Every structure is written in C-alpha cells, then in structure tokens.
Amino acid sequence: MNIVKYTKRFSSLTEKFDCGNFIINNFLKSGDALDKNQGITYVMLSDEKNYIIGYYNISVGRVDQIEIVGNEKLYKPMGGSVNINFLAIHSEFQRTQMAEFNGRKVYLGDYILRDCEKRVLGLRKNIGIAFVTLNSTQEGYHLYHERNSYEDFDEDMSNFVQDSDNSGYKLYKWVDDIIGA
C-alpha cells in the first residue's frame, strides 16, 4: 500500500470507490478532491496502484473559544488547526485488521488516520498548529473517539466548519497528544 497525494493521474480510479457514504464518495469523485481551495487530498492505493483503498483530505483552520458577553458572541482564538475534511476506507476494506500491537488491533482506518497525523506533525514544524479537528459520521465515531483519543468539541468551542452533512460529531485532538509528538 502507498499513500500519495491525489492527482488527476488517479482520477479514473475513483469510479470504483465506495465507502458507503454518498457525500464522502462524491467529494472524491466530483473533482473537488483536486481543488486546492478545498484542501489537499491523499489516497491510499493498492500495491499495484490500480485501486483506491481509502483517502483523506486536509486543510487548515483555527479553533476559537466562544465567549458570550451580553447578547454578543466573541470568538477568542485557541490555536491553529488542521481539519480532516474527509477520511474514508472503501467498504470492501472496512474493518480489515492490519496488525496487532500490545493487544490492540490496528485496522486500515487506524493506519490511514496515523498517516494523516504524521503529516500534521510534519506541517507543525513550519506553521502553528495546536489541534486536529474533524466532523465524524456516526459510523466513524468509534474509530476517532474510542480508538484514537479524539474528544467531542466543548460547547464553547468553534471552528467555523460548515458541512452539508450536519448529522456528524465535531471532534478534536491536541497535536501534542499525537503519539510521537
């Protein structure tokens, strides 16, 4: 498996990608995944580079603390963030165990998330990043919250991410909490 930056070269491979979520599939297939204004997309390819196993898309942002003064909301910056806009594994490979480490099973979803977190650590050397943020689907919540220590946004936190699928969970992780930081 290889995880590489998504380019037009791989666009024909998106036809077979299906993670079970229309919005997440459509982002990859529509061409938005190639739009740098929408973030940078990375794909997990088969060894033969002829199949997309999974992908993620990241962009930068900021996490603010909301303070209510009278009738006004004031936004106090808490720190820069890398937003995981999308992260998905093809439905044929979901729940595929790759390894076991200290009694903990490691799945493809954990593997691609770890690659994303390593990329965040690399970016942190050049730009201010305090958080990794994401909007999780109900199906993905277990991967992030329970298996990889992402926390639910507090009521007084905001990152201004607007998603057309508002049924998800807003989660964050301090970059300092990424193993290997």
Where are these regions (language model features)?
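Non-catalytic substrate-recognition and accessory regions of acyl/acetyltransferase enzymes
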Residues: 1-103, 111, 115-137, 142-181
